[in-house]
């Protein structure tokens, strides 16, 4: 049986839904905000956002956070995965789902992640992801 992480990374949403009990157990074991010292790659929302199929990555992210009640403090892990996979749709969705006062920090964090993954032009990508996709 594939690991739940691999199922998320591959965007196998139907398989993921069949394994809801495992997701619930993972959620139960996640440290509280402030105590969460895991690496980005240790979080299944990173795996979902890192999915090569960007549409499935977005749908998997929505499933984890909206239907399964995945902890909101873990969204940073998903943001890192979305930046690494260049998932503009998911970045746009995340940006539009946060409070206004968090948006400036979010843009800075995305830019930092894109730079760390050697994106040739982070500011153009961010402009596309956050503003062009709205149109």
Task: Enumerate the predicted regions with their spans.
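Ankyrin repeat (ANK) tandem alpha-helical domains that serve as protein-protein interaction scaffolds
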Residues: 1-135
């Amino acid at each position: 049986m594939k690991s739940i992480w691999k199922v998320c990374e591959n965007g196998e949403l139907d398989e993921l839904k069949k394994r809801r009990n495992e997701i619930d157990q993972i959620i139960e074991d996640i440290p509280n905000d402030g105590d969460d010292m895991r690496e980005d790659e240790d979080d299944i929302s990173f795996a979902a956002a890192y999915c090569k199929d960007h549409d499935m990555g977005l749908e998997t992210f929505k499933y984890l956070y909206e239907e399964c009640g995945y902890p909101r403090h873990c969204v940073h892990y998903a943001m890192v995965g979305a930046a690494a996979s260049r998932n503009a749709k998911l970045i746009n969705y995340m940006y539009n789902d946060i409070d206004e006062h968090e948006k400036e920090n979010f843009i800075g964090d995305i830019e930092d992640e894109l730079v760390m993954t050697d994106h040739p032009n982070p500011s153009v990508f961010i402009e596309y992801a956050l503003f062009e996709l709205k149109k």
